[in-house]
From Swiss-Prot:
<dbReference type="InterPro" id="IPR001865">
    <property type="entry name" value="Ribosomal_uS2"/>
</dbReference>
<dbReference type="GO" id="GO:0022627">
    <property type="term" value="C:cytosolic small ribosomal subunit"/>
</dbReference>
<feature type="region of interest" description="Disordered">
    <location>
        <begin position="251"/>
        <end position="272"/>
    </location>
</feature>
<dbReference type="GO" id="GO:0003735">
    <property type="term" value="F:structural constituent of ribosome"/>
</dbReference>
<dbReference type="Pfam" id="PF00318">
    <property type="entry name" value="Ribosomal_S2"/>
</dbReference>
<keyword id="KW-0689">Ribosomal protein</keyword>
<protein>
    <recommendedName>
        <fullName>Small ribosomal subunit protein uS2</fullName>
    </recommendedName>
</protein>
<dbReference type="GO" id="GO:0006412">
    <property type="term" value="P:translation"/>
</dbReference>
<dbReference type="InterPro" id="IPR023591">
    <property type="entry name" value="Ribosomal_uS2_flav_dom_sf"/>
</dbReference>
<dbReference type="InterPro" id="IPR005706">
    <property type="entry name" value="Ribosomal_uS2_bac/mit/plastid"/>
</dbReference>
<comment type="similarity">
    <text>Belongs to the universal ribosomal protein uS2 family.</text>
</comment>
<feature type="compositionally biased region" description="Low complexity">
    <location>
        <begin position="253"/>
        <end position="264"/>
    </location>
</feature>
<dbReference type="InterPro" id="IPR018130">
    <property type="entry name" value="Ribosomal_uS2_CS"/>
</dbReference>
<keyword id="KW-0687">Ribonucleoprotein</keyword>
Length: 272
């Protein structure tokens, strides 16, 4: 369960929606009231939605899944890149490139190109066999690719789930995820459609503090999932290394010819 209180959410301004004239009627059930022409979100319902999203992400990661963090609006860029990096998950904080998921094979080739360029020494004009101008152009290419794809450079396959800060801003990313059957967790403000994603979180998607709070929570869910995953691995490893009981060894040698028993016992020792 997510470690968050109503006080945390209020201080982060998560209850402020958009102007009443800009609302999406599908958000009606998550709106508590309106004040000075602004919709106020029902944070009690938001808390339940956060818990569901948190548990989903935790379970996804615990079962060897990956979560792609997406937030390209200015208010979200720093939080998305920092929190995804904290838990070693891929992210997109710059412009979403069309086909980033649906044409993943081509995108992967561009990532390979980025890694290739990162191996180059752009100051070694003599050793590279290239001119200064050629090296400068290659360095610019590397910088451009790093900005566009740096967050997914270690994403070897399409993600198991996606966390999005603003479903309207990231409509293309959400669309691509749905085409591939990838579940989406998203912050959904009063001007958005909560039915467009599997795990909506009704909240202000413009306040920097609010974005940081929710993005950090989802990263915490990833961290818990990773701990659970490593715990399962350690348990499985421990069970594999558990020495064979005496009665189990007897079963292996029971009824074996006396002359062959020592050889079999020796074989058991090697196997262990």
């Amino acid at each position: 369960m997510a470690q968050i209180t109503m006080s945390d959410m209020l201080k982060a301004g998560l209850h402020f929606g958009h102007q009443t004239r800009r609302w999406n009627p599908k958000m009606k059930q998550f709106i508590l009231t309106q004040r000075n022409g602004i919709h106020i979100i029902n944070l009690f319902k938001s808390l339940d939605m956060i818990d569901k999203a948190y548990d989903f992400i935790k379970a996804t990661v615990a079962h060897n899944g990956t979560v792609l963090f997406v937030g390209t609006k200015k208010q979200a860029q720093e939080a998305v890149s920092a929190q995804a990096t904290r838990v070693n998950m891929p992210y997109v904080s710059e412009r979403w490139l069309g086909g980033m998921l649906t044409n993943f094979q081509t995108v992967s080739k561009r990532v390979s190109r980025l890694k290739e360029l990162e191996e180059m020494d752009f100051t070694d004009v003599h050793g590279s066999g290239l001119t200064k101008k050629e090296l400068l152009l290659l360095e610019r290419e590397k910088d451009k690719l790093a900005k566009q794809l740096g967050g997914i450079r270690n994403m070897n396959r399409t993600p198991s789930a996606m966390f999005v800060v603003d479903v309207n801003k990231e409509a293309l990313a959400v669309e691509e995820a749905h085409k591939l059957g990838i579940p989406v967790v998203a912050i959904v403000d009063t001007n958005a459609d909560p039915e467009s994603v599997e795990y909506p979180i009704a909240a202000n998607d413009d306040a920097i503090r609010g974005i940081e709070l929710l993005t950090s929570l989802m990263a915490d869910a990833v961290a818990e999932g990773l701990l659970e995953r490593s715990g399962k691995a350690a348990k499985a490893e421990g069970e594999a290394e558990q020495p064979m009981a005496a009665w189990e060894k007897e079963l292996l040698t029971e009824g074996a010819p006396a002359a062959e028993a020592p050889a079999e016992a020796e074989g058991e020792t090697k196997a262990e």
